[in-house]
């Protein structure tokens, strides 16, 4: 497969990931309000779960073809999840003096994202 085709697959996945991130974030604001960065937390945990599934699928050769790795892994999940937004959310919480919320956000993002990746991986491995 040519490098141009691979870049096209990554861009396609990225477009869907970015749109999904926006929609999930907006839905979280509607459902849960703006008092906590629920949107970032949600996309990071869901993205980690999908990555766990994806890694297990590649290992078991359920998704052995290379375009899927680029479309889902680099494109979709790369655009869906975000460390820079997570960092900025925490800076804003710090500036507001909301140190408990900031700490909670850090703990929840790290713990739930790693747990979700492990659960996703285990689901397809067993």
UniProtKB/Swiss-Prot annotation:
A molecular function (GO) term: metal ion binding
Gene Ontology biological process terms from the UniProt entry: cellular detoxification of fluoride
Domain of life: Bacteria
Catalytic activity field: fluoride(in) = fluoride(out)
Main subcellular localisation: membrane
Protein's UniProt keywords contain Transport: yes
A cellular-component GO term for this protein: plasma membrane
Sequence intervals crossing the membrane: 4-24, 38-58, 71-91, 104-124
Recorded topology in the membrane: Multi-pass membrane protein
Keywords: Cell inner membrane, Cell membrane, Ion channel, Ion transport, Membrane, Metal-binding, Sodium, Transmembrane, Transmembrane helix, Transport
Modes of activity regulation: Na(+) is not transported, but it plays an essential structural role and its presence is essential for fluoride channel function.
Binding sites annotated in the UniProt record for Na(+): 78, 81
Cell compartment(s), UniProt: Cell inner membrane
Free-text function comment from the UniProt entry: Fluoride-specific ion channel. Important for reducing fluoride concentration in the cell, thus reducing its toxicity.
NCBIfam families for this protein: crcB, PRK14200.1
Family named by the database record: Belongs to the fluoride channel Fluc/FEX (TC 1.A.43) family.
Record-linked PANTHER family: FLUORIDE EXPORT PROTEIN 1-RELATED (PTHR28259:SF1)
UniProt-recorded name of the protein: Fluoride-specific ion channel FluC
